[in-house]
């Protein structure tokens, strides 16, 4: 039985070497064809349609600001992203939702802190539902706690609401968002409010 197992494993190794070897590239992998442009030529009653090979574009386009010290500065995105830009944020997080370290992402300190804050806000808003650790089999997720409208660490039932926050023109505001994002570009007519 052991001899048969050795024979099968040896044949498997030889087959792998044959498939991965340089001779296999000719029939296993086809060469890249390049981009083709469809050209229509009419000569009298005949119409010839042919595909001419065009130059292939660059794999990665050049950034507008190549002297920037981090990817966000290089692409001029410094004050132009928020917690809602999930595609941008997902490049800097692990599959389970944690932030990648600065040495991996190549971000400067300021942008790393801003991205970290945006990732936290996106998690809280529920915009990154797939980026969380998977539960072991057989475990059921706990029910989400009800929203604590009073923003305190005590149970909402034990808290007395604040009925008077002041007159409308002099109300005590509630902090919303992050002060790190206060310099962001605002495209709406209303200015960005950090206190609601």
From Swiss-Prot:
It is found in: Mitochondrion. GO terms for molecular function: structural constituent of ribosome. The keyword Mitochondrion applies. It comes from the Eukaryota. Its main location: mitochondrion. Residues 1-34 form a transit peptide. One of its GO terms (biological process) is mitochondrial translation. The keyword Transmembrane helix does not apply. Keywords: Mitochondrion, Ribonucleoprotein, Ribosomal protein, Transit peptide. InterPro entries: Ribosomal_bS18 (IPR001648), Ribosomal_bS18_sf (IPR036870). GO terms for cellular component: mitochondrial inner membrane; mitochondrial large ribosomal subunit; mitochondrial small ribosomal subunit; mitochondrion. Component of the mitochondrial ribosome small subunit (28S) which comprises a 12S rRNA and about 30 distinct proteins. Belongs to the bacterial ribosomal protein bS18 family. Mitochondrion-specific ribosomal protein mL66 subfamily. This is Large ribosomal subunit protein mL66. It comes from Mus musculus (Mouse).
């Amino acid at each position: 039985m052991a001899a048969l197992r050795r024979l099968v494993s040896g044949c498997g190794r030889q087959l792998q070497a044959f498939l991965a070897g340089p001779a296999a590239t000719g029939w296993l992998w086809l060469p890249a064809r390049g981009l083709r442009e469809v050209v229509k030529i009419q000569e009298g009653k005949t119409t010839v349609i042919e595909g001419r090979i065009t130059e292939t574009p660059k794999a990665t386009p050049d950034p507008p600001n190549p002297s920037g010290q981090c990817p966000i500065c290089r692409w001029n995105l410094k004050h132009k992203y928020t917690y809602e830009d999930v595609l941008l944020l997902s490049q800097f997080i692990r599959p389970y939702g944690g932030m990648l370290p600065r040495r991996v992402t190549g971000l400067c300190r300021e942008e790393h802190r801003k991205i970290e804050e945006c990732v936290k806000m996106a998690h809280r808003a529920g915009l990154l539902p797939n980026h969380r650790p998977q539960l072991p089999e057989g475990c059921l997720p706990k029910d989400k706690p009800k929203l604590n409208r009073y923003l305190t660490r005590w149970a909402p039932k034990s808290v007395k609401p604040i009925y008077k926050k002041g007159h409308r023109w002099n109300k005590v505001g509630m902090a919303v968002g992050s002060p790190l994002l206060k310099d962001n570009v605002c495209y709406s007519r209303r200015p960005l409010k950090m206190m609601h």
